[in-house]
Amino acid sequence: MKKLKVAILYYSSTGVNYQLAQWATEAAQSAETEVRRLKFRETAPQQAIEGNDAWKAFHNSEENKRETEASLDDLEWADVLIFSVPTRYGSVPSQVQSFIDTTGGLWFEGKLANKVVTAMTSAQNVHGGQETTLLSIYKTMMHWGAIPVAPGYTFQESFEVGGNPYGTSTQTDGTGKVLDDVKPGVEKQV
């Protein structure tokens, strides 16, 4: 039987969504899938990065530097797409949207249809737009013809990690720390 190909696509300014993507990678590998963990290209001005100590520290870290950037070939390759992105004003960050805006050719050729998609997110406060961020990802995926798969309330860990039916979401303190114990939720969602 052919192994499922899983692309874990993340953007992380301070390391929180990198951590979620690592947990998702471990969970996908334990399910004996072929996995690629890929980051979205950083497009923020250097001045913005330098103005935030946590962002600067993660951006310049060895772990961030050795991660591979996502490409359109990765989207075409994958059977399953797992997104982990921070919330920006109730939507995805510009780095993620810029990448999504380049997928028109794949979409037009039908190469994004029937891919299974799920997503997770983080924000600095409890009601920081996590649910709308996940819905904005799923809305785009529906335009692609992909198949969004949210965890819903199908496992106990969902309630223990904030109860977001659209995907695992967590709160961060802005320094790169995950404030909630969401690892079990990430593992179940994957």
Feature names for model-found ranges:
Residues 86, 92, 130-131, 169:
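Gly/Ser/Thr-rich beta-alpha loop segments that engage phosphate groups in nucleotides
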Residues 101-108, 125, 143, 167-168:
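Alpha-helix boundary/capping detector
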Residues 147-190:
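Glycine-rich phosphate/pyrophosphate-binding loop and the adjoining helix
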Residues 1-111, 174-189:
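N-terminal beta1-alpha1-beta2 submodule of the flavodoxin-like/Rossmannoid cofactor-binding fold
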Residues 13-15, 20, 47-51, 120, ...:
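Accessory recognition modules or surfaces
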Residues 113-161:
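Short, glycine-/small-residue-rich phosphate/pyrophosphate-handling segment
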